[in-house]
């Protein structure tokens, strides 16, 4: 399971010209599901995302997680993160989770974060989304479990 996280000052997701999810300070989480992923990996990754210290403390060091920084999550499904780009000029998605598997794990990820008290907004699974963000830093990390 893969989470590409970006520290943002604002981010939003639009579908059909309508904003369906938006946050101010926080993390934009692009979430990719691979074939071997399961609920155990989902929980491990969700905990890592929520605990990862990418926000600056009073000394300018990255010592605060999203909750400690008073931020929120915007979680967007992105199956292309599971692409194999090692050969040729076209990505292969043979390692990506099936749409049914990915939807279940995406929804579990969001529910898990919310159950832990994390303010969490979402995109729309499998929709054509327009994602806008202001990357703060820029700070971007690729987390995998």
UniProtKB/Swiss-Prot annotation:
GO biological process, one term: D-amino acid catabolic process
Main location: cytoplasm
Catalytic activity: glycyl-tRNA(Ala) + H2O = tRNA(Ala) + glycine + H(+); a D-aminoacyl-tRNA + H2O = a tRNA + a D-alpha-amino acid + H(+)
UniProt motif Gly-cisPro motif, important for rejection of L-amino acids: location: 137-138
Any one cellular-component term (Gene Ontology): cytoplasm
Protein name as it appears in the record: D-aminoacyl-tRNA deacylase
UniProt-listed Gene3D superfamilies: D-tyrosyl-tRNA(Tyr) deacylase
Disulphide bridges: none
GO MF annotation terms: D-tyrosyl-tRNA(Tyr) deacylase activity; Gly-tRNA(Ala) deacylase activity; Ser(Gly)-tRNA(Ala) hydrolase activity; tRNA binding
Subunit structure: Homodimer.
Keyword RNA-binding attached: yes
Listed InterPro entries: Daa-tRNA_deacyls_DTD, DTD-like_sf
A Pfam short name: Tyr_Deacylase
Gene responsible for this protein: dtd
Compartment(s) of residence: Cytoplasm
Assigned protein family: Belongs to the DTD family.
Record's function text: An aminoacyl-tRNA editing enzyme that deacylates mischarged D-aminoacyl-tRNAs. Also deacylates mischarged glycyl-tRNA(Ala), protecting cells against glycine mischarging by AlaRS. Acts via tRNA-based rather than protein-based catalysis; rejects L-amino acids rather than detecting D-amino acids in the active site. By recycling D-aminoacyl-tRNA to D-amino acids and free tRNA molecules, this enzyme counteracts the toxicity associated with the formation of D-aminoacyl-tRNA entities in vivo and helps enforce protein L-homochirality.
Keyword Lyase: no
Domains (record comment): A Gly-cisPro motif from one monomer fits into the active site of the other monomer to allow specific chiral rejection of L-amino acids.
EC number(s) given by UniProt: 3.1.1.96
Keyword annotations: Cytoplasm, Hydrolase, RNA-binding, tRNA-binding
